[in-house]
Amino acid sequence: VDHPEMVLGNLELESTQYGHDLTVAPIEGAVLADQLAEEMKALGVSDVRVEDKCYVYGKIPATKGYEGKTKLGFIAHMDTVSDYCDHDIIPVVHKNYDGGDLPLGTSGRTLTVKDFPHLPSLAGRTLITTDGTTVLGADDKAGVAEIMTMAEALIKENIPHGPISIAFTPDEEVGGGTDHFNVEKFGAQFAY
């Protein structure tokens, strides 16, 4: 994680869908949508807007000479699962992780190398986990963080690229994430 502060701020905001009523945009989702829009603007993303039902859109124009390249899109959903302790999320940052068993705060829960044999391959990296008392919300706030990090790199490092569209959607966890997605305004030929 290059920007744990960005991830942490977004993880701490509650963004679960209220029940299964897709006609209601949750207040917390609106807060996260507005926060992401402001972060996108600060990074230099253009045409940033929050549309009805908390859909967030933005564009990164092509660099000079790449305007005719394929229009790519990147999409992640903002809502998180609400089946298990989704309030008062306490993310824990493990800097320079040692590759061993990973205690989840003071909850008594531990991610063990025995149960997760890939853990040693992450030694030396910064990991973000829950404190063990709530879900982390990394599905798909980690995707949001990756897209924001990509946007920052493309813009600040002036990496050549074609037109890029970005979208953050609500309601994926309850099956409504694309119900009001504006494909035409999104404008990508292909999206990930």
Feature names for model-found ranges:
Residues D2-T126:
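Acidic/His- and Gly-rich active-site-bordering loop/insert found
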Residues P120-Y192:
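Acidic/histidine-rich catalytic neighborhood of metal-dependent amide-processing enzymes
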